[in-house]
């Protein structure tokens, strides 16, 4: 027996909801669409549903009830009261196929097998307290190991203290220096890893308990790296090997090939790739760059990456690497392309930016019977409508004369913010939802919302209500 689902909706969304359900195909499930006495479905709450929805009214067995994604309130308590399984659907009706698993892979993104080393490149210039604060921020972003970068000809007198402070917080620590004295200090202070040992410094590994990262004498001298690998294997000591990723136009492609060659020749050797030479030295948004580099790392089954966040455009590199390693791991394990797992790395453009065509928005607008402005974005531009009509423009200034809000400062302020968001969404090809911030993926951490509580009225709505009481 197929599952029977009841969809709750409002007046304006009913037609589009029915169309989307039918597009899923008759074999998916049986269903009823119940329109509650509300125009905008997204404004219904759990309390409202409890007052206006009766399961007996459908006259059929109900396996679950799906309410609009923006519905607020305690659906668990509502489900207990009604004796039904109740869940939120997607925010946009066009995403129903995704909700029902038609396109999303539904993989477990908690799985990954690439360690992230996050380097604090100016550690000698920071106090121990500031190093700890930076390290904690990197850990929140997904770093597994905090790398303390040493600077040439710069004293790091508090290196041991910094290592011990991080270890006391249960953080794994690496120290990055070409000076043997720094690496000895790091090892004796309890550092988990030391970067980087060239072949002529292999003997240092015998003096400390830290796991070394091996690099070639010169990036192009892979034979020296293989000799170092052999020496460490004969010692029976753990290590990582790094053939060194070079900047684009300065040996990048050849250096990628060295990682592939190392993996093929030594499938048993743990490998680290430093990504900063590409992310830091390329003027391109790092979400895409990080995705490609982690794609290479996961495909070659590399074991770790070292990333930096020095340049302002690299400020999210640690978080991007964390999302990228999880997405790429899920794609590899499911033997599929890295698509439809997460939108976290789609920071500038959306895969499906405009859920409705201009004709569909016009049909929605024709159903509106109140003066409140609705805003939607389609391929043709910004669509603004209420009971008095629909206007479409690509520049918010073109809409000003049609809005008639010169005497209502609070409402004009609100519409200005929403139209600015809508214009950005149209220009970049992003998803726009009225009263919601634009989704910038991993580039900006949006405050978490508690859908069990009702959203407090915004200051512009409070001002309009206050003004209405005075008139």
Where are the regions that the model predicts?
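Conserved, mostly hydrophobic/aromatic
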Residues: 65, 138, 142, 176, ...
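Alpha-helix-loop-beta-strand connector modules within alpha/beta enzyme cores
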Residues: 81-83, 111-116, 153-185, 207-214, ...
